[in-house]
Amino acid sequence: MAIDFCTHNNYLRSNCGAYELLFWTMSDCQQDPSGKTNTKPVVWATSTVKFGWNVEGIYPKGTDGTHINGVCGSHDGQLLACGDDYGLVTLFRDPCRAKHVPRAYRGHSEHVVRTLFGDDDQYLYSIGGYD
């Protein structure tokens, strides 16, 4: 599960294990069924949801997406980092389209559960499962 907030705190977006990308209005804490349309002009303060048009290229062809454990966008909006079940941290340009070639780095013996860019995007941190 992941949650992102917009820069003006009007909207929140979330995803879950049921592969749903949901949008919520912060003023009344209600789900917005038209959120995909209503949030087109919105700038997101964070980028951690693993479903959406800007992350569609993180899933290799022929996979169901369950191996991607976490996504994190850089603060400058240029990069996406993913952690997966194979111990890899994969770095993509943001937005990530299908057929974009990422850079993959092995740093864990087990699955990578989360990635996080430092405040100035100079460092990328990753958290492993059972390392």
Task: Identify the residue ranges that each predicted region occupies.
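WD40-repeat beta-propeller superdomains and closely related acidic/aromatic-rich repeat-like regions
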Residues: 1-131
